Amino acid sequence: MQVILLDKVVNLGGLGDIVKVKDGYARNFLIPTGAARRATASAKAEFEAKRVELEKQAAEKLAAAQQLGEKLNGVNVKLTQKAGVDGRLFGSVTNADIAEELTKAGFAVAKSQVRLVNGPIKTVGDATVVVALHTDVSVEVTVSVYGDHS
């Protein structure tokens, strides 16, 4: 199926690109999330009419993500979890926990934007996580996990 991309999609293309993708990928992901439309003649004409507005919106999203990235870069998030004497946590620190702490600190971050490269954090100490604010903007945040031995 051919689709017109309405937003930048990683490993696929940018705004306005007409790409051929598998039918299921288009029907189940790209079209429902608003990232693409079917590439019909009427959709192409409608897209060209709205192209300037869509490019402006994309530039605004990128600028907002870059601004948040500058504030967020190098931030240290402190979390306290129950832990054993050997430093292992009872449970783990997930992307949802980190996103919740960042939101409490005043940064609008969704849990889907927090990338834990090595999986959930299961030990006491510092870990570096990546926060992907936009397809072009990602920053590193340090997470300090402290053990609560009570």
From Swiss-Prot:
| Record keyword Nuclease present | no
Q: Which Pfam families match?
A: Ribosomal_L9_C, Ribosomal_L9_N
Q: Which GO terms describe its molecular function?
A: rRNA binding; structural constituent of ribosome
Instruction: Supply one GO CC term from the record.
Output: ribosome
* BP GO annotations: translation
Q: Has keyword Ribosomal protein?
A: yes
Question: Which keywords are on file for this protein?
Answer: Ribonucleoprotein, Ribosomal protein, RNA-binding, rRNA-binding
The cross-references to InterPro entries, in alphabetical order and at most eight, read: Ribosomal_bL9, Ribosomal_bL9/RNase_H1_N, Ribosomal_bL9_bac/chp, Ribosomal_bL9_C, Ribosomal_bL9_C_sf, Ribosomal_bL9_N, Ribosomal_bL9_N_sf
Q: Which NCBIfam families match?
A: L9
Q: Which family does it belong to?
A: Belongs to the bacterial ribosomal protein bL9 family.
In terms of PANTHER family, this protein maps to: 50S RIBOSOMAL PROTEIN L9
**Job description of the protein:** Binds to the 23S rRNA.
Q: State the protein's name.
A: Large ribosomal subunit protein bL9
